[in-house]
């Protein structure tokens, strides 16, 4: 992550799917450093914008269908601006897309 640059990304409540979601974010952003801050009850996941998360990557990691609305139920908050207009992906950035 760039020095002095606050990352963007989801803040998720702890669940059985967290490890798969984290790996899916890493898979979707292979050239970015992904920082994970575990606060026991929740996990903050962040990287330099834009940060992408696709349904295909989550399904690949978890081995099952995974509608993105399930992420919305886990997401207590997020850093940055989140574009959820596509049912197959989320993008976090600093500006409106």
Ranges and model annotations:
Residues 31-36:
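A short linear hydrophobic-aromatic micro-motif
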Residues 21-29, 69-75:
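Short, solvent-exposed secondary-structure boundary motifs
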Residues 39-42, 46-97:
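Helix-rich interaction surfaces within compact, conserved domain-sized segments
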Residues 1-22, 28, 41-61:
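Conserved N-terminal glycine/acidic-rich loop preference
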């Amino acid at each position: 992550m760039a020095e002095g640059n606050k990352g963007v990304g989801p803040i998720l409540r702890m669940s059985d799917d967290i490890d798969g979601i984290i790996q899916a974010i890493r898979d979707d952003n292979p050239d970015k450093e992904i920082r994970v801050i575990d606060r026991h009850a929740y996990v903050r996941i962040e990287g330099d914008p834009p940060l992408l998360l696709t349904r295909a990557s989550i399904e690949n990691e978890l081995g099952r269908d995974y509608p993105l609305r399930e992420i919305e139920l886990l997401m207590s908050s997020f850093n940055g601006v989140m574009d959820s207009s596509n049912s197959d992906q989320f993008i976090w950035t600093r500006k409106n897309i």
